[in-house]
From Swiss-Prot:
It comes from the Bacteria. One of its GO terms (molecular function) is L-ascorbic acid binding. Its cofactor is Fe(2+); L-ascorbate. The keyword Amino-acid biosynthesis does not apply. Its EC number is 1.14.11.-. Keywords: Dioxygenase, Iron, Metal-binding, Oxidoreductase, Vitamin C. This is PKHD-type hydroxylase BBta_1313. Binds 1 Fe(2+) ion per subunit. Fe cation binds at H98, D100, H161. The lineage of its organism: Bacteria, Pseudomonadati, Pseudomonadota, Alphaproteobacteria, Hyphomicrobiales.
């Protein structure tokens, strides 16, 4: 399940983020990569324990958890503190094909999560750079993702994925992982489809329609059946 969520950050928010990051120090992105990923990772990132990364990360989490589409798709239990990366054409930056670690731990908070979903929040507009597509492999083939600044994409952390070489400009993004209350990806996908259907039908039929009440009850009972807390 690959889901795009528009407008997590406003354009003004993105501009503020970029202004702050432009005056920040960046380090080699391999510092947070696993052994295999480090061999194919060439980018820079804000130090994960820096005050800038933590403050901007908190703002992203607050914005995401106020977004109904994100909540419906992810059903988050734990969200890893967002990280920030930078791919520059003049440095030949890219990230070869890899899969994310199954478990991530945060040294500052002690949080350890199972990485069910990977998240990329774009902070550069598509016209600011060439290349830099996020390429995600799944059962249906290969998908290239390059979204407007402020939009994010959710995809299974078990997916093989890569970032193609940036050949012009600079690509800046936030990336992180989350553990969902619904561990099984098929169950999570069905829950999301049911939620979307309920929202669409409620606009036509009204939330107090008896059939809508039954469907809403089914939604909550399925979450009750599958959820891990």
């Amino acid at each position: 399940m690959l889901i795009c969520v528009p407008g997590i950050l406003s354009k003004d928010d993105v501009a503020e983020f970029r202004h702050i990051m432009d005056s920040s120090d960046w380090e080699d992105g391999r510092s947070t990569a696993g052994a295999q990923s480090a061999m194919v990772k060439r980018n820079e990132q804000l130090p994960p324990d820096s005050e800038v990364a933590r403050k901007l990360g908190h703002r992203i989490i607050s914005a995401m958890t106020a977004n109904p589409r994100f909540l419906a798709a992810a059903i988050p239990q734990h969200i890893f503190p967002p990280l920030f990366n930078r791919y520059a054409a003049d440095s030949g930056h890219h990230f070869g094909i890899h899969v994310d670690n199954a478990v991530r731990g945060d040294k500052l908070t002690g949080l350890r999560i199972r990485t069910d979903l990977s998240v990329t929040l774009f902070l550069s507009e598509p016209e600011e750079y060439d290349g830099g597509e996020l390429v995600i492999e799944d059962l249906y083939g290969s998908h290239e993702v390059k979204l407007p600044a402020g939009d994010l994409v959710l995809y299974p952390a078990s997916s093989l994925h890569m970032v193609t070489p940036v050949t012009r400009g600079v690509r800046i993004a936030s990336f992180f992982w989350l553990q969902s209350m619904i561990r099984d990806p098929l169950a999570r996908s069905m829950i999301f489809d049911l939620d979307t259907t309920i929202q669409d039908l409620s606009r036509r039929m009204g939330r107090d329609d008896p059939e809508m009440v039954r469907l809403t009850g089914l939604y909550h009972n399925l979450i009750r059946y599958w959820a891990e807390t």
